[in-house]
Amino acid sequence: MAYNKTNISFGLAVLLIAVVTNCTGCKKRTTINVPRAILQARSATLDELLHIVNRLDGIRTLKASNIKAEYTSEKKEGSLIELEKYPRAPGYIMLKRPDSLRLVIQNPVIKKSELTLVSVGDEFRVWVHGRHKFYIGKNSSEELISDDLEEDTEIPIRAGHIFEAVFPESIPLNDPDIRFTKIEEEDAYAKYYVITVYRNGPSARILPLREFRIERSGLTISRQRIFNDDGQVVSDIHYSDPEQIDKYTLPGKINIERPLDGYTLELEIKDWVVNSVFKDDTFSLEPVEGIKVIRFK
């Protein structure tokens, strides 16, 4: 009888593998736990996703009397990176459209105000209570310069950074110069829709403005990225612990990364209150007698 040498060699190879692995035709099964967020991913149209981004337009004011803030600054010197982390501190926050904010940070032990930040329009005012100093400047300033040469003018944080994180700018649906795209993404934890907003630029260019990542099991915004005209990320904002307040979904945690400004601000927020009425002087802040006032150009 004639035998095919190839078949004999293949059969011997299979037998050898079975002996070495001490397995005679058995199969190894592995169980993988798929995260619930992936299993429960929902579908949404582009119009529905745009509504999710824009639905916060119905909120005129927001406040939270129970927040915790943690600030980390980053300084680069050559190949070295120096991180300075400030302890988590309690406080409260109040916001009013279109551009008013009041943020108070308190001493963690005695709950006395340590820092008060008020911003209306382009002007911000900061009162550092313990240092008896009062700063006045512009949110639009890339660099804060003071005539007082003794002052450290490195104040990278701006009220606008916080405002745009809490109140994401809505997407203009009828602006002919605005374009937006929808794609799908997935990681080990969840599935996402990603909406990227562009603006028509010079010649054939389109310029990225903002990007929203929407987690599909809850259809909530989990991340927002904001770009400058060169396509660099100026704000990378992560949202988590969403909570339903009235008819709105609001985050319990907001992490603001400002890579070009060299700082990160993490906010843990409880007890959101929607559309309350504020006093007329809520967003006013004047220096008290005897305090040193530093004005930035």
Segment roles from a protein language model:
Residues 64, 103-104, 124, 162, ...:
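Buried hydrophobic packing residues in well-ordered domains
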Residues 98-161:
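An acidic-aromatic
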